[in-house]
From Swiss-Prot:
Gene that produces this protein: vht1
GO biological process: biotin import across plasma membrane; dethiobiotin import across plasma membrane
Organism of derivation: Schizosaccharomyces pombe (strain 972 / ATCC 24843) (Fission yeast)
Family according to the record: Belongs to the major facilitator superfamily. Allantoate permease family.
TM spans (from-to): 85-105, 123-143, 158-178, 187-207, 222-242, 257-277, 345-365, 384-404, 411-431, 439-459, 470-490, 508-528
Pfam families cross-referenced by the UniProt entry: MFS_1
Protein name per Swiss-Prot or TrEMBL: Vitamin H transporter 1
Membrane-topology descriptor: Multi-pass membrane protein
InterPro entries, A to Z: MFS (IPR011701), MFS_trans_sf (IPR036259)
Amino acid sequence: MASEWPETSRASSVEENPKLNIPEIVESVSDSKPSLKNQFSTTVIDSSDLNVFNDGAETTVKEQEFTSSELRRLQKLRLKMDLRIIPCLWILYFLSCCLRFTVSLSFTMNTAQGHSLIQTLSGYSAHYLALGLALFYVGYIIFEVPSNLMMAFIEPRIWVSRIQLTIGVVGACHAVLGTKHGNAQSYVALRFFLGVAESGLWPGLAYYMSRWYRGKHLGKRIGWYYTAAQIAAAAVSLVSAGFQKMDGARGLYGYQWMFLIWGVVAIAQALSIPWWLPAVASKEHRKSLSSFIPLPKWMKTLSPQRIGFLTPADKSLHSRYIAEMNVGKRWQWSDLLKSCLDLRVWPFILMYFGIVGVGNGIFNYCTLIIEEINPSFSGIDISLLNAPIWLADALGIVTVMPLYDRFHKKFSFFTGSCLIIIAGLAVANYAPRAWSRYGGLLMIGFGLGPTVPICMAWCSASMAKTYGDVGVASSLALVTGLGNLGSVVTTYALYSGWPGDPTFRKSNDVCIALIGVSIIACGIEFLLDKTGFGQFNASFNNHDHEVEDEQEMTDIKPALPSSQQADA
């Protein structure tokens, strides 16, 4: 909108556009907003600049585009946010993944000395091992939605810090399994509580990111910190060799040192998060966790709220930039129900079900699949061949996600990645040579990499525009919670859980079908997004229309001299 109106005949303009005569409009609203009359008593709007009260249509203002200088400022602002936010989230997710992966490593650490978790755990049996693995997902799924919804009530960075803190505490408590108090029942309980502690982390991180970046800038950045999982898988294997050297030090087994050290590091990082991550813009209904805890005055000086991040000018620009994501809108419980019943959520769940199920199935049984491809491979060979598959996964993320953010072709990039997975599964199943089949595993890893970040970014952007905070929190929790049932299917019903499939080829065929389901669900999601079918209107949208009518009137005013602007 121009700051100064063109020098045209005001009389003719009023005659040609009688509905655009602001004095008449102001008279109709002067009873409720007397101050508006003084601001607009001499202003006439040209219909080429603005469409206001036109033939009874809803009041709208043409969206103000960013100027070239503002676009350059936005680039610098996003870089500033990247440098502050991404490293913290990457380290956070890396440490949480390390604590998750260390449990499986403890089964084989220091086996020659008889000091592995399996060898030292009282009452151990294969039944308890499977039960512990299953209950991890049960705890994760049950508490996923309530944990993520807490971010709509409590400042997100505080809740993320709480999640990481409990992950570190429960992870460190696994060291108890090597003492006289440890037994199979305590192992099962700790696995369950680790799932409860981790619930809400992955969707919570995506929710937090959606409060800082628009949907078109979200996918690449989710992919950046998602690479922490792949790096963690390789890192814990290498670092575990060092922990095995510590076996017997101060009377502790090697795996006990591993649990303790990773847990303490995670706890330390969790305590730094409130000062490291910037606070999300919020309304008065969101409370800080510290507001419920009485603190002495000297501690208030160390409050995270006192740590500055954005300048007032940056905050103003960011507010305009992030407006389409409906950050901080006041919502009602009916909006939560609407977001859960929105038809778009359920295709996302099926998309996530297929890709995460196949991903966890392949990666959990990857060493066994490599061994089946060539039984002559030694244990060291298998370990060395396992790492490149994770690296291929990370390569897929850093290669595809920048292109995804650049071209915004959600359906094309997701289905393209899924087709690479299907091709990889087919090669791993039916290629005549062992190394060709191993190449199929690399293809699977590359294709799987970008699928989860695309799914999360797409869901965040779609639901934020319709339901705001509560829509993002609830939908991401449902997608990751129910979608992780795919992991249960592939982990326990396929591969080693399928007695009639010793070569794993039937399991790979089922995985191809699961990826096919993800592709079909992606097509349905694309159509629902385009047509708007199955969506509901959030309660805050009705309130916003009333507010916008008043806000537009305050925005439409003639340019004032600098002295008068200062008074205003």
